[in-house]
Amino acid sequence: MGERATGQRPSAPPSLDLEVRVRLAHARIAHLLDRAGIRGLHLKGYATEPGVYPEHRRSSDVDLLVHPADAAAVIELLRSHGWEPVAAFSEGSIFQHAATLWHDQLGYVDVHRLFPGLGASPEAAFDALWSEHAHLVIAGRPVPVPSPRHQRLVVIVHAARDPFRGGLDVRHIRESLPAESWAALREEAHRLHAGAAWHVATGEAADGVDTRQLTLFAALHESQSGLELFRTRWQSAATVRERAVLVARTIPVNRPHLQMRLGRPVTRADLWREQRARLGALAGWAWTKAVRRDR
């Protein structure tokens, strides 16, 4: 169910049924992390209690949230047990929040070092979710998952970046909860600094919400991309340093993104053509901005 910004494709799909392999992957990963003494929370999909999603929803991968300090160790642990890197953190979304790995029998896992829109910091978000985590038996093994209320909050926060299925998920949660439970969930969203994502996903009042985050999540909800999204991120940046980092991350071509778009392996000519187009678009935007400022 997670976002995947990669064009790499396995040479052959796993022989197992999709649901079976995803459930087995949850159990296997939980076993590996438990044996290594590393905390990890399984998010969304089959790692939720009945009723969180509409009926008959299927999942295509494992979403695993770990403490940022453990992210590198988790990647290495999975690599040592048959998972191969597909996209690094820097090659994923604009938040650089997840790395994707592939296992020939168990399929994809997205390792999250943060959950965009949730928490004052990645560390605070993980600690808040872990502080009241529960266990859900998946493929015969207890798997660490957020509490029932946090399961729903994670789905709603994610919906701010997924306007299609996410909208259905939010509507389902809202309609399936009593009014007082929905109000309590809203309060929890604000307590965990998820007000911007909550507003964008639910359309409810945005009182007291960080306007920069609100602008960014609204752009993602509207499926902005390319130069349009760059403009929004530039306007949302609070400091010169943030804008410098934005430019530095925007200029290099994201190979997995490009491969996904092309549907084939990327060549040097593809990279050069994409790089030239990207630099040209940024130069044109900078020129237009300078001309407007001088008027």
List each model region and its residues.
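Conserved NTP-donor binding/palm subdomain of two-metal-ion nucleotidyltransferases/polymerases, i.e.
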Residues: 1-60, 66-295
